């Protein structure tokens, strides 16, 4: 009976639904503090979205304005989210370009964010500000503390001119962040049953409310202003609170829909509930009408219906349900309860013209999820039924802990051993799952950063993830079926398994969403260009990126992004052998980025060298050939010699420049590389003083740099064949794949064994990409590995000669041989998967032995590649052996 009475009037006042959530009567100042904090979080998330749209100045201005307003309020309540947002923005800017000034600023801002987070966490705990339905007061600022600590530690580690003491402090910060995130992650997993239960109740209950109270945990609208719970004196404050709730709802709605960055945003233009059962889903309430006429008798049922947020039930009728009388559950009260969660097998169904897996019991945490058919509106609506604070906690922990797990699992073994001693190590698969979940389910800065990480891992120029060891015909059906992951608020373990087995079918969906939301940022164009190149669509990638900068309406505001954009486009031109465009972009980079100016100029010179050779070989026809060759020779010599002058601590042009990571004068690996290459060239020129500089070059460094950026896996057939021919320019007469014969010799110097090893290695890589595995492996064995491996048989210890001419080559050749062996073995119809795994694992361990000869150029990159492959093969061993 009492439940029926409670359902009979329109709602205005807010009262607690459980004693545990009560703050003592109508304590409006306490409610206002909670809503003020939630609004601050939404503002911070919007500011960081501005950065993702290449409008960092607007985002920073928004934060500064809101911080100033907060200070002028003279409130004792902190606003710890603003320093974190500023720190995240500075961190992203710093790690895009490594400029010393930005690195220092990021360190300072993140240190302030750490202090502010700690202060805010203590404040929320002391004043019992219940901003979450399941987590204790202050939890959200434990997340901001962990996030700021992690990012600060990374900044400190990347600033290599720090002292040993500073580096030790950074490792301690990293360990502190790891421990905090590990604890928070376990708490989230333990709280998942409670979260799912509360979410289901919210979805049942909000359909009869005038306003969503999800951001005031433990409270709901009452239905009778005449009751003892609602006094006329509290009505103005109730209206004010409802105004705040509506504003927060609209802020979250526009952020989820991607309309929060427009200058004239109409948050009603996209209706996430258009597929719901009712014929008409009205917009959010118009509280101006309520304020102008606050009497409940003046609000007709029709007006109340129009003012309802989730109006699926008629206003003014009895609606009695035992479920609706349920109180929300506090996670602290129920963590010890045994709440069974069923997990039936997934239901596969056709939806929107494509295959997908549909989920029923939706969890924004999504560690394990039941399956049943559901509409897209069910999936989308969860974003609005989850409070801003809970969303931030879940996405923040999953992003940060995921990044930590992946990065720690990829670092070279020598460093990994040190880190394991101080108490933490990574789990690659667990970390990748966290990143995928965050990228799919979170429409905030955490989701987009998770997506950027995934794109770098899968489509970036460095192979962090080795997917080269695949067992044919062993893939499950789920890996071959592609389902939609856009606009999802949940993803199951079974779905994640399918996604991680076939990532190239899912990253494009997320990237399309990001490009739709952030139309101004060239960073997303860059990522799409990388993705197209990784799929072998080199011309399409170049057309996309060149077309973007050619359009006068497009502008890249952040010079760090412009530098990355130019560098990647330069490499794409290099893969396509568009030498003039490649050199042009590299020369431009000198004015855009100070990170490795010497490499930019050196590679511009190598581009002219390669065009020179292409003309000499008769592969490119030009007018005034002799004049063109002379001009190219001059440009090649000029830029190749100019490059070392920009190397920090070495050249005259670097005397007043702060190059290197963090702006110190420590030389980067590629700085050391080009100094070594130039030293070799100078030695050859001394031995052949009458030769022109361009004729003293052996195997062109052009092909080395292409390999370092994974170019042979991105070239189309014609460019792979052209690479093999160009590499033959310096080959010994009548040798394999050489352009020279005893009667027709293009090269003026003798090909040394060291230069021949380089040439054959790159030709082998091109042959493999052409599918000519046997030829490529034969070159690798006979002309590269046999030159330094002196003993390699099952009955004797592995022995090799330590060579120094090209330090990266020797471990890399063994690493690449394992991939040749795998491809050849698994292409046979009756292949032995166990023997293939064992043989490849043996080769990779030998590569690891050869690699462990101390620090050298590309040592970290080489070790990372070997480790990624070993991890993949070890996984196969555990599966098949």
Curated annotation (Swiss-Prot):
Residues 206-237 are annotated as: Disordered. GO terms for cellular component: cytosol; mitochondrial outer membrane; nucleus. It is found in: Cytoplasm; Nucleus. The keyword Cell membrane does not apply. Keywords: Cytoplasm, Nucleus, Phosphoprotein. Pfam families: Iml2-TPR_39 (PF10300). Inclusion body (IB) resident protein that interacts strongly with lipid droplet (LD) proteins. Involved in LD-mediated IB clearing after protein folding stress, probably by enabling access to the IBs of an LD-stored soluble sterol derivative that acts as a chaperone in inclusion clearing. PANTHER family: TETRATRICOPEPTIDE REPEAT PROTEIN 39 FAMILY MEMBER, TETRATRICOPEPTIDE REPEAT PROTEIN 39C. Interacts with lipid droplet proteins. Belongs to the IML2 family. This is Inclusion body clearance protein IML2. It comes from Meyerozyma guilliermondii (strain ATCC 6260 / CBS 566 / DSM 6381 / JCM 1539 / NBRC 10279 / NRRL Y-324) (Yeast). The lineage of its organism: Eukaryota, Fungi, Dikarya, Ascomycota, Saccharomycotina.
């Amino acid at each position: 009976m009492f439940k029926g009475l409670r359902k009979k009037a329109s709602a205005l006042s807010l009262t607690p639904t459980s004693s545990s959530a009560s703050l003592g009567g109508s304590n409006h100042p306490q409610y206002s503090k909670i809503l003020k904090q939630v609004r601050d979080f939404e503002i911070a998330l919007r500011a960081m979205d501005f950065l993702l749209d290449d409008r960092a100045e607007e985002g920073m201005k928004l934060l500064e304005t809101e911080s100033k307003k907060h200070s002028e309020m003279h409130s004792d309540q902190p606003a710890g989210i603003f320093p974190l947002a500023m720190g995240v923005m500075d961190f992203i800017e710093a790690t895009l370009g490594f400029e010393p000034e930005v690195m220092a600023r990021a360190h300072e801002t993140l240190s302030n964010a750490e202090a502010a987070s700690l202060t805010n966490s203590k404040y929320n705990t002391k004043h019992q500000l219940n901003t979450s339905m399941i987590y204790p007061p202050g939890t959200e600022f434990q997340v901001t503390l962990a996030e700021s600590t992690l990012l600060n530690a990374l900044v400190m580690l990347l600033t290599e001119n720090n002292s040993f003491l500073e580096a030790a402090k950074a490792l301690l910060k990293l360990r502190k962040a790891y421990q905090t995130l590990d604890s928070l992650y376990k708490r989230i997993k333990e709280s998942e049953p409670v979260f799912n239960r509360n979410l289901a109740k919210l979805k049942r209950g909000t359909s009869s409310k005038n306003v969503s109270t999800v951001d005031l945990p433990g409270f709901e609208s009452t239905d009778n202003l005449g009751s003892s719970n609602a006094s006329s004196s509290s009505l103005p404050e109730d209206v004010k609170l409802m105004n705040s709730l509506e504003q927060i709802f609209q802020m979250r709605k526009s952020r989820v829909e991607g309309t929060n960055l427009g200058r004239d945003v109409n948050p009603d233009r996209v209706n996430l509930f258009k597929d719901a059962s009712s014929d008409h889903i009205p917009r959010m309430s118009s509280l101006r009408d309520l304020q102008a006429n606050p009497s409940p008798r003046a609000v007709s049922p029709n007006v109340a219906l129009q003012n309802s947020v989730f109006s699926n039930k008629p206003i003014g009728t009895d609606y009695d349900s035992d479920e609706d009388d349920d109180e929300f559950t506090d996670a602290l009260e129920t963590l010890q309860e045994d709440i069974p969660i069923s997990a039936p097998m997934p239901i596969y169904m056709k939806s929107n013209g494509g295959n997908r897996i549909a989920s029923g019991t939706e969890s924004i945490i999504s560690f394990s999820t039941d399956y049943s058919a559901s509409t897209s509106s069910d999936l989308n609506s969860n974003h609005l039924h989850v409070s801003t604070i809970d969303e931030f906690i879940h996405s923040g922990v999953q992003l940060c802990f995921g990044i930590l797990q992946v990065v720690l699992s990829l670092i070279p073994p020598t460093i990994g051993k040190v880190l394991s001693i101080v108490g933490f190590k990574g789990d690659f698969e667990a970390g990748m799952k966290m990143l995928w979940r965050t990228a799919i389910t979170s429409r905030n800065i955490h989701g987009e950063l998770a997506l950027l990480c995934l794109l770098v891992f899968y489509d970036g120029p460095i192979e962090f993830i080795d997917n080269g060891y695949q067992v044919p015909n062993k893939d499950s059906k789920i890996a071959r079926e592609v389902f939609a992951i856009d606009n999802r608020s949940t993803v199951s373990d079974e779905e994640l398994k399918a996604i991680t087995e076939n990532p190239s079918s899912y990253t494009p969906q997320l990237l399309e969403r990001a490009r739709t939301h952030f139309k101004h940022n060239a960073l997303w164009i860059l990522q799409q260009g990388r993705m197209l190149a990784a799929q072998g669509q080199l011309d399409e990638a170049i057309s996309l990126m060149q077309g973007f900068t050619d359009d006068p309406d497009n502008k890249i505001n952040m010079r760090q992004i412009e530098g990355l954009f130019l560098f990647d486009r330069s490499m794409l031109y290099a893969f396509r052998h568009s030498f003039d465009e490649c050199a042009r972009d590299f020369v431009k980079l000198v004015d855009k980025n100070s990170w490795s100016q010497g490499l930019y100029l050196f590679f511009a010179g190598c581009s002219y060298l390669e065009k020179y050779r292409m003309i000499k070989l008769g592969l490119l026809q030009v007018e005034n050939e002799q004049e063109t060759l002379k001009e190219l020779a001059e440009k090649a010599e000029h830029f190749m010699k100019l490059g070392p002058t920009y190397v920090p601590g070495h050249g005259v042009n670097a005397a007043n420049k702060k190059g290197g990571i963090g702006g110190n004068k420590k030389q980067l690996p590629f700085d050391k590389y080009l100094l070594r290459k130039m030293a070799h060239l100078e030695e050859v020129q001394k031995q052949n003083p009458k030769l022109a500089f361009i004729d003293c070059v052996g195997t062109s460094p052009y092909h080395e740099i292409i390999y370092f950026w994974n170019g042979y896996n991105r070239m189309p057939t014609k460019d792979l064949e052209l690479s093999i021919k160009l590499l033959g320019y310096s080959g010994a007469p009548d040798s394999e794949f050489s352009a020279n014969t005893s009667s027709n010799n293009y090269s003026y110097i003798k090909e040394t064994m060291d230069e021949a090893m380089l040439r054959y290695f790159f030709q082998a890589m091109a042959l493999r990409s052409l599918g000519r595995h046997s030829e490529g492996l034969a070159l690798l064995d006979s002309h590269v590995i046999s030159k330094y491996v002196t003993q390699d048989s099952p009955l004797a210890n592995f022995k090799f000669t330590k060579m120094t001419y090209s330090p990266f080559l020797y471990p890399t050749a063994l690493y690449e041989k394992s991939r040749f062996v795998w491809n050849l073995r698994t292409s046979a119809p009756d292949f032995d998967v166990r023997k293939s795994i064992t043989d490849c694992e043996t080769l990779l361990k030998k590569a690891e032995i050869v690699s462990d000869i101390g620090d050298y150029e590309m040592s970290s990159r080489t070790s990372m590649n070997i480790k990624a492959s070993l991890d993949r093969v070890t996984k196969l061993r555990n599966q098949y052996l």
